[in-house]
């Protein structure tokens, strides 16, 4: 259904039917997991506040960052007319940012704590996505590289923080089940992110035509980045519900 929504000619009734079927199946699966004695996926860890927050809001964040490597090459090649080598070289800056910040992530968690770090860095993630929406064919290469590098830094910090906090307060006996549930949700979020990116491009096409902005290079992709930034912002709402000392058993170690 999500894939159909992102096509040029979405089939209304088929899409609605698939969404309805998926919703009913999902609710039935939840009911089954809660009732059966030995479910394939146990939901016991959902009673842990930190795990629940990272699963709900964290999934929206993972979906939004998963859309970035899909949107950027398309914007550079289809929207701006770059060749594949040029576009791919620019996108590498995101992954350089991912790698170079890794050694500093743990000290940042211990310094700020999980809640403060996820809120501050989450806001920076939103700004980085909005900055991608401001990129034009005339933007200097060094500015594009800086924006993408910083975006990679922020997404890496957020991803590591969420993944660490998820298991910080989960009791030992539930750890295996929690890991299965978290891994499943992560993979679903990655697929959802790509679908949301395609839908965002489609919405960007419609909005750009409605506002008579179709002559602006890459406008549909740039508007898609705005939509993804909003999704990332919504994912931060759950973080506000965290206790001030959430995950302190992990973040306070070796201080």
Where are these regions (language model features)?
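C-terminal membrane-cytosol helix-exit motif in multi-pass small-molecule transporters
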Residues: 1-4, 21-36, 235-243
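Phenylalanine-glycine-rich, low-complexity intrinsically disordered regions
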Residues: 1-15
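12-transmembrane solute porter fold
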Residues: 11-13, 18, 38-207, 216-246
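Short, intrinsically disordered terminal tails adjacent to the first/last structured region
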Residues: 252-255
